[in-house]
Amino acid sequence: RSTLFPYTTLFRSDRMGPVELASCAFGQSSKISYMEMAAAVCAVVNGGRLMQPYLVSDILNPDGSILQHTEPVCRRQVIKPETSETMREMMEAVVLYGGGRNARIQGYRVGGKSGTSQKLDSADEKARIASFVAVAPIDDPQFLCLVCLDEPHSWTTAGGSLSAPVCAEVLEQTLVYKGVPRAVEPETDTDPAQTAADLPADGDSFDGA
């Protein structure tokens, strides 16, 4: 179990055989909370630093003064800063040209990734959880939104189709509320048609939706 979240189940290296290693490659060997998922993605985009997640930043007195403040704590460096930079570029490409197009926000650079997972504790073998995580601005990460839809009733279970638009709406309102200025979307030398051919057209779906 993880020390970060007591109900999270992870494989230790000394208990991971060939089967566990293979299944971990596509995310079917570990159970984690949505909070821990968000923390992991934050580490991917913020230079590789795994931060201790928290829910309350400040506790205020009745007069508005700060009674207690939570200081951000870096648990450890999990990937190199150069790797984090590469991942930000890849996540932005997903939103610009791949299965995350529905997460685009006019005037803001957004990066994201879809995730359509099998739900093993359901009586329906086709049950899925459609998710999408988005970060903005992806060139200077400030906000992350993770949307997970449990067994959505839709023609598709792809997170890029169902959850990405919700991420876009939440992030756009947050960016505007926080006063982050809109900017002209950057030009790219990459051919959109060529890039799109290398990326999933509609997220990660086990049933091909």
Predicted regions and their residues:
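Short, small-residue-biased leader/transition segments that mark boundaries at the very start
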Residues: 3-10
